[in-house]
């Protein structure tokens, strides 16, 4: 499957398209984003032994996160968390409207297929990392595997070795920036590190070899993205990539109707083929999805329920990815009389999960047509990003996007750039 990427850093999000359909929406978080690293402070009054957890103060603005003691690294002779202590921690679950961020002290950096973990690196190496070469990093990884591990994803057997080398370079790039900032710490608690490059979160979801074109909002960002790809990815030398840029972010939104995409993504009702529609309702406890046949009819009435559920399953998987729904999800399918139809639906649903790379755990399909499943929450859902308690208030997002200064896109840049041999920068009027 091939993808096209639209990166609009001015508006704080990027989108992943496949065959003219939006697959992912990736938001840039101002604070407590996924994989952000802090030097956190644990006050005495924030330790709760009965809960076996504590609340950690993350920065000078008194933002807090929740950390279970099982995810907190303690010294070998230490049984309890010492009050007023400081830990290097990382965000593994972003905060929602009513829940704080979930933290861990097992620090890691990741790319699409590689996961770099380090929890016990000796301090004598700290002065080496900012200026060390990539091969030296690999050597130290082999010499001290207990302190620095690189874990390979199970799908790496299908990945080109040049892709793995490129991802290793990106890990080294992030690794060096992290330790450079660690050496400059002057006060605690304090925010330490975030992947400031807006392109890196995309590489955590996709392989670069599956991307065709990039769309950015200015020539300067196109040049920066080209420099990043050539510097940190070896595969760029063998593959042609196009980077298309527009005069402003609003011009991109206007061409691709992104405002209407967000508006639709927050509406509870999603229409599919043949009049079938699904209704998505998000509450604090769970997410319910109701399948309705609508005006759909079939010549064979006994196959109507199964056919309706199969069509709705495709839209359900797409909406789970697009809206980033997580937690407990209950799907109310149209009732099916025959057990063979239920087995057919489950097999088809598992097939959709595999081809769409959605990490979902199926629990059971009850006799009344309720499919129970769970999905681990990491990023915020689209509702949490815009802090909409009631999803019917989708006009808030619509007004927010349209409030962008429409006069910006009138800037005329009378240029047509086609630069370099492997990465082409193309201006779109």
Curated annotation (Swiss-Prot):
Q: Name one GO molecular function term.
A: RNA nuclease activity
Top-rank taxon, per record: Eukaryota
Q: Which GO biological process entries does UniProt record here? A: mRNA processing; rRNA processing
From the record, give the transmembrane residue ranges: none
* Gene3D superfamilies attached to this UniProt entry: Nucleic acid-binding proteins
Q: Give one Pfam hit by family name.
A: RNase_E_G
Q: What is its EC number?
A: 3.1.26.-
Family named by the database record: Belongs to the RNase E/G family.
- Described function: Involved in intercistronic processing of primary transcripts from chloroplast operons. The endonucleolytic activity of the enzyme depends on the number of phosphates at the 5' end, is inhibited by structured RNA, and preferentially cleaves A/U-rich sequences.
Protein name as annotated: Ribonuclease E/G-like protein
Q: What is the species of this protein? A: Guillardia theta
């Amino acid at each position: 499957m091939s993808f096209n990427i639209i990166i609009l850093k001015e508006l704080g999000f990027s989108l992943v398209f496949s065959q003219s359909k939006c697959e992912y929406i990736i938001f840039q978080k101002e604070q407590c984003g996924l994989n952000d690293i802090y030097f956190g402070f644990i006050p005495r009054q924030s330790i709760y032994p009965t809960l076996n957890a504590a609340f950690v103060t993350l920065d000078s603005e008194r933002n807090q996160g929740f950390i279970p003691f099982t995810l907190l690294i303690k010294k070998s002779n230490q049984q309890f968390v010492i009050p007023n202590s400081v830990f290097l921690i990382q965000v593994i679950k972003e905060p929602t409207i009513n829940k704080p961020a979930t933290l861990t002290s097992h620090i890691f950096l990741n790319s699409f297929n590689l996961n770099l973990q380090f929890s016990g690196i000796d301090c004598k190496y700290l002065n080496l990392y900012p200026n060390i070469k990539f091969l030296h990093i690999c050597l130290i990884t082999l010499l001290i595997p207990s302190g620095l591990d690189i874990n390979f994803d199970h799908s790496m057997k299908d990945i080109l070795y040049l892709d793995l080398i490129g991802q290793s370079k990106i890990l080294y790039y992030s690794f060096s920036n992290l330790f450079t900032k660690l050496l400059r710490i002057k006060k605690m608690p304090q925010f330490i590190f975030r992947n400031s490059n807006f392109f890196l979160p995309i590489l955590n979801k996709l392989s670069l070899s599956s991307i065709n074109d990039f769309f950015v909002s200015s020539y300067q960002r196109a040049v920066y993205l080209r420099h990043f790809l050539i510097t940190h990815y070896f595969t760029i030398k063998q593959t042609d990539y196009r980077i298309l840029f527009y005069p402003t972010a609003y011009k991109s939104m206007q061409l691709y109707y992104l405002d209407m995409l967000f508006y639709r993504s927050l509406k509870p009702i999603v229409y599919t083929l043949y009049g079938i529609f699904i209704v998505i309702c998000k509450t604090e406890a769970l997410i319910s999805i109701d399948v309705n046949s609508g005006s759909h009819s079939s010549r064979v009435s006994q196959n109507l329920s199964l056919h309706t559920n199969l069509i709705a399953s495709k839209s359900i998987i797409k909406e789970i990815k697009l809206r980033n729904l997580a937690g407990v999800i209950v799907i109310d399918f149209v009732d099916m009389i025959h057990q063979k139809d239920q087995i057919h639906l489950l097999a088809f649903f598992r097939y959709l999960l595999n081809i769409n790379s959605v990490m979902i755990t199926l629990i059971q399909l009850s006799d009344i047509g309720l499919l129970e499943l769970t999905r681990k929450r990491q990023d915020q859902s689209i509702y949490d990003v815009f802090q909409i308690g009631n999803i019917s208030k989708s006009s808030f997002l619509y007004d927010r996007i349209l409030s962008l200064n429409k006069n910006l896109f009138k800037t005329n840049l009378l240029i047509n750039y086609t630069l370099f041999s492997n990465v082409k920068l193309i201006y779109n009027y």
